[in-house]
Swiss-Prot record:
<keyword id="KW-0687">Ribonucleoprotein</keyword>
<comment type="similarity">
    <text>Belongs to the bacterial ribosomal protein bL34 family.</text>
</comment>
<dbReference type="GO" id="GO:0003735">
    <property type="term" value="F:structural constituent of ribosome"/>
</dbReference>
<dbReference type="GO" id="GO:1990904">
    <property type="term" value="C:ribonucleoprotein complex"/>
</dbReference>
<dbReference type="GO" id="GO:0006412">
    <property type="term" value="P:translation"/>
</dbReference>
<dbReference type="Pfam" id="PF00468">
    <property type="entry name" value="Ribosomal_L34"/>
</dbReference>
<protein>
    <recommendedName>
        <fullName>Large ribosomal subunit protein bL34</fullName>
    </recommendedName>
</protein>
<dbReference type="InterPro" id="IPR000271">
    <property type="entry name" value="Ribosomal_bL34"/>
</dbReference>
<keyword id="KW-0689">Ribosomal protein</keyword>
<dbReference type="GO" id="GO:0005840">
    <property type="term" value="C:ribosome"/>
</dbReference>
<dbReference type="InterPro" id="IPR020939">
    <property type="entry name" value="Ribosomal_bL34_CS"/>
</dbReference>
Length: 45
């Protein structure tokens, strides 16, 4: 039996999918712009 692949960790979640990471790159800012345009309640982790 293999282990479960999702091992929740809030710090890792924020570091890989967080708002500050999204703001760092041009592509990340594009993602945020798309999510704002769509009207998402939460923009990032």
């Amino acid at each position: 039996m293999s282990k479960r692949t999702f091992q929740p960790n809030n710090r890792r979640r924020a570091k890989t999918h967080g708002f500050r990471l999204r703001m760092r790159t041009r592509a990340g800012r594009a993602i945020l712009a798309n999510r704002r345009a769509k009207g998402r309640a939460s923009l990032s982790a």
